């Protein structure tokens, strides 16, 4: 079993073994920030499409009187390279989406397919997670049973609390301390030790590379599980902050949105079970993170303690994604008015809030005297589908997982009424039980193609080419799925009536995201050729004066830097 795992992750294993070489390659390129760029600030506006930026920058009929509605992003674009053909990861879930940005790799290399996925070489957690993954046995150095891997809010001590239930933490101070090791899947090959998020990712990250080269690093996100950004060993981040986005909403004294709205008392009392359930409350959640980022720009840590301005830092915004996808029963529907991506009033407000927040961030960079030597990258982990909400169809009754309910592990099966559920949004990612024929399962799905509104199905060579050959045998990847199904555009397998969109799939609306790379010394430029969010990673390390090959995934996959950045930097 140990041999199997070494073979299937050969690229990652070799990269880890060459840690000294990696450090030397980084050092050979010079000290962090030895060139023009001293800092890189990375912002992910989750859900924001390339067309969202186009519309808000130019204006669109029927919205805001036809006038532009993102003045700060539009101003940023005047000294930025705009990559209009950017694609996110596939699957386009947040977990692999962020992994692509910070590693330069795809799921076959990083091992991150979804926040809730499957690994045939691990065993279940000791206790049931907050999202329903049951605990189970683990025999040290024995044969693994395989398990669903839960890396969302379920690994928190208490995901109803903004601090994730972190022992002794302040009310708003979520982060690594929020992780309950009893909620983590276990690795029998290491004596059943819990697999922390930073050890779940197979490759190093931009944060671990910059940290190893002497740079101070920080990241802000939505779950403690996104601390995978620290990279293997967990030492790549000096400051990680992740207030739990799926916690109960509380008042936030001293926090106000960039639009000037105070967050105490609670803005929307009708939806307090999660920050993601309300157009208003999600802005306060993001404002809390912006406040932490502003502290970091000022040379403090996220709590205001003494630190230094990071060489590499950033955060994600949730508000646009919520504005795109939520149907708030007591308020109204978000999303779009038409296929041209004209936003509804609710989505418009979220875009304006994020834009105002970015204005605050830029002003803070200027106030700290570091704007000129900061490279600012604005992109998105994923898009959202469908933009044309009339095409939205949520079907939780006939999905690939329900059709194959007896052929997939019980932890993934819809037949498990108290379990965490299948990995299905506007994509279905399927891992089969040991011994189940892939060809037979595919034939079954084809028999129900009209029921599941089948778009495309990937298995065998069509899957292995980009995702490795998955399976239980030596030489097969224990994490790679057996089958991937993408439905017709607009169809999601969630069955949700509180959503009017989703992501995870391969559709254009899922994957064509905003990408701006900006610096005050840049000349505005539009690049129309296709690029990927994975190219952000080598672009960042190169801008900071380090070698792109210090990134494991770059060496393995050959990921290139984004075009034109270096030319703009040296002009």
Where are these regions (language model features)?
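Loop/turn elements at helix/coil->beta-strand transitions in domains of secreted/extracellular proteins
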Residues: 36-41, 79-83, 109, 137, ...
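Short, structured active-site-proximal loop/turn typified by the sulfatase FGly-forming signature C/S-X-P-X-R
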Residues: 53-111, 216-218
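Short, solvent-exposed turn/loop segments enriched in Gly/Ser/Thr/Pro and often Arg
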Residues: 82-102, 220-230, 316-318, 554-561
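Catalytic-site neighborhoods of secreted/periplasmic enzymes
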Residues: 144-149, 153-189, 193-260, 551
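Active-site neighborhoods of enzymes that stabilize oxyanions during catalysis
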Residues: 173-186, 199-204, 414-539
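Active-site His/acidic residue clusters
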Residues: 223-224, 228-239, 300-353, 390-392
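Metal-dependent active-site segment of extracytoplasmic phospho-/sulfohydrolases and closely related
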Residues: 352-395, 466, 540
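Acidic/histidine-rich catalytic neighborhood
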Residues: 373, 380-435
């Amino acid at each position: 079993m140990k041999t199997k795992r070494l073979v299937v992750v050969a690229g990652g294993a070799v990269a880890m073994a060459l840690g000294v070489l990696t450090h030397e390659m980084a050092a050979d390129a010079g000290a962090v920030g030895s060139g023009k760029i001293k800092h890189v600030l990375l912002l992910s506006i989750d859900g924001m499409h390339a067309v969202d930026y186009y519309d808000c920058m130019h204006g669109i009929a029927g919205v805001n009187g036809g006038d532009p509605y993102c003045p700060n992003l539009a101003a940023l674009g005047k000294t930025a390279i705009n990559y209009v053909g950017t694609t996110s990861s596939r699957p386009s879930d947040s977990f692999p989406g962020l992994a692509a940005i910070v590693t330069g790799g795809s799921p076959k290399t990083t091992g991150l397919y979804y926040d809730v996925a499957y690994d045939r070489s691990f065993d279940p957690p000791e206790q049931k997670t907050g999202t329903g993954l049951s605990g189970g046995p683990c025999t040290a150095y024995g044969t693994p049973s395989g398990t669903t891997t839960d890396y969302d809010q379920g690994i928190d001590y208490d995901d109803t609390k903004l601090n994730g239930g972190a022992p002794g933490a302040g009310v708003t101070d979520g982060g690594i301390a929020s992780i309950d090791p009893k909620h983590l899947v276990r690795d029998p090959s290491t004596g059943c030790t819990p697999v922390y998020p930073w050890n779940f990712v197979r490759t190093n990250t931009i944060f671990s590379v910059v940290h190893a080269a002497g740079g101070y690093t920080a990241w802000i996100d939505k779950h403690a599980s996104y601390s995978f950004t620290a990279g293997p060993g967990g030492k790549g981040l000096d400051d990680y902050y992740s207030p739990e986005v799926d916690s109960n909403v509380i008042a936030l004294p001293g926090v106000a949105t960039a639009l000037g709205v105070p967050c105490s008392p609670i803005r929307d009392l009708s939806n307090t079970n999660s920050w993601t359930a309300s157009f208003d409350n999600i802005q306060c959640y993001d404002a809390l993170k912006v406040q932490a980022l502003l502290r970091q720009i000022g040379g403090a840590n996220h709590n205001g303690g003494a630190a230094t301005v990071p060489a590499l830092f950033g955060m994600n915004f949730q508000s646009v994604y919520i504005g795109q996808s939520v149907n708030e029963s007591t308020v109204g529907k978000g999303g779009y008015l038409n296929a041209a991506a004209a936003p509804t009033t609710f989505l418009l407000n979220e875009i304006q809030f994020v834009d105002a927040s970015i204005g605050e961030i830029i002003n803070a960079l200027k106030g700290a005297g570091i704007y000129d030597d900061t490279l600012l990258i604005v992109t998105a982990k994923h898009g959202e589908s469908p933009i044309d909400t009339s095409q939205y169809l949520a079907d939780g009754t006939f999905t690939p997982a329900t059709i194959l309910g007896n052929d997939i592990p019980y932890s993934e099966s819809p037949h498990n009424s108290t379990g965490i559920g299948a990995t299905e949004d506007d994509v279905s990612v399927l891992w089969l039980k040991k011994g189940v024929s892939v060809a037979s399962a595919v034939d079954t799905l084809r028999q129900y193609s009209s029921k599941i509104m089948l778009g495309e199905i990937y298995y065998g060579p069509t899957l292995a080419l980009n995702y490795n050959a998955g399976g239980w045998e030596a030489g097969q990847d224990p994490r790679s799925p057996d089958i991937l199904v993408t439905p017709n555009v607009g169809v999601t397998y969630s069955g949700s009536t509180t959503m009017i969109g989703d992501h995870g799939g391969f559709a254009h609306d899922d994957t064509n995201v905003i990408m701006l790379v900006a610096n005050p010394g840049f000349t505005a430029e539009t690049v129309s050729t296709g690029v990927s969010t994975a190219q952000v990673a080598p672009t960042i390390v190169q801008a900071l004066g380090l070698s792109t090959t210090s990134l494991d995934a770059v060496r393995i996959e050959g990921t290139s830097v984004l075009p034109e950045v270096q030319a703009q930097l040296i002009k």
